[in-house]
């Protein structure tokens, strides 16, 4: 934790400096590689961790080494992870997907923005200094056309996005030759289908079945295609966003870049303060990962924070505004029905979802059904025109373990299943949001209920937190639940930071949350038996046993912290080659002793073999040459 708290001015200045000096940066001893596909422009980025050779013998003067293979890993950092790419936040990222979108010839450019609010903001000269300068001309589907990845998948079309994803999900594991590295324990997949090799056809089939989604708005061409589904790698979402009391555009862009560097597969912009529209534009134009939002937050800002004053018209305008900016998925709390609200009355913590509480208040105030539910088909029509995926929000999720798995939670979940089928009628991609706060023994039921009632649409959960007693450590309490539900089949985990329940996360909190959740997601992949998931673990274990300290640091999810902890007690360069660490010291290192035992056993085997040969030689009378009949 920082010893001195920065002032607001200092925080903004630091963020501005970060943006001004931003350049593509590789992790220690890593390099960016690209694997090309058959579609034009399909060039999939990965990070390859270079390893040092293993000493296998020889003398001090002439040591003998065995090379260790480089380890390819999934990389979410986009251009920010490539030192060869010049970064300019003022201009935004290259439009990777634009040629693919244009080649499909099913979209048209808009001469006028569809949102009244957008037109008002663009006409306000006072916002010129805040506004991103290189605004895109938005596109939408041509009349009568649908431009969603689900629509293409159902038509039997393998898009470049699907091929990109297939290559990416395989993580370059076909490059690994070592049997030691390729060894993997069988997993327990709970019904997930995990093919040894992921093909573009498999991606298409999963999307067509609704078991996976590709969040890819046609107005966010900068994004690198990724997939969310239980038959793929478990993904992690990071939340960022300003509020009425803290954070700025500069800081949110900094957190975006920081999030992608530390492994965020998607980012949700949950801004609720001033300049939501302008902040989101900067984020989208500089994001290599899909961006999600909760549109009701901004709609509420438009009616001065008074939930009762919300209208369908204001919400619809917000959807159009955000869809034309390029938001890839919307969280919509359409399952909070009027008749479900009384079910929360006996709860210990009531309704804890911001979106859920807003809609519950509106329903009770007007004594009418949720207008998001009433207008859900119109929402789907908008999403189908831009390929915005729907993340059906769990507005009645439990906010304490006492309220877990109650009547209100599952009533809403069943309604989300009904809405899923409606969205699929419009070829709109859907995932389902889940809890929340759930003790460990009650977690699996959440997954089985979701699969049954939501027709295997991808599940996306916030944790869940497994205990309520650890404010300041809720990244850990929730990481336990996240690993479990990821193993059971959850497709994406929404990170929780140490600041959960306490305040808005800063840059370091974002990193802590992401590292915790990358651990949870990876542990789930291992438990499911995802092909190739164990390669990095095996490489780390081999480096650890061989005291290759630099390789251990570089293989870590956070190389910098691993190195820093080691160097607190052994900072000298000699410590990087020592066959011990400060935990046990040179005489009690279990791995050093284990190596000595192994060497001793090998020597003993040789000695036993030589003794046997000697005994055999003496038994034959000491003759050097055998008689022909004996040979």
UniProtKB/Swiss-Prot annotation:
Its cofactor is [4Fe-4S] cluster. Binds 1 [4Fe-4S] cluster per subunit. The cluster is coordinated with 3 cysteines and an exchangeable S-adenosyl-L-methionine. Zn(2+) binds at residues 437, 501. Transmembrane segments: none annotated. Pathway: Cofactor biosynthesis; thiamine diphosphate biosynthesis. The keyword 4Fe-4S applies. This is Phosphomethylpyrimidine synthase. It comes from Shigella flexneri.
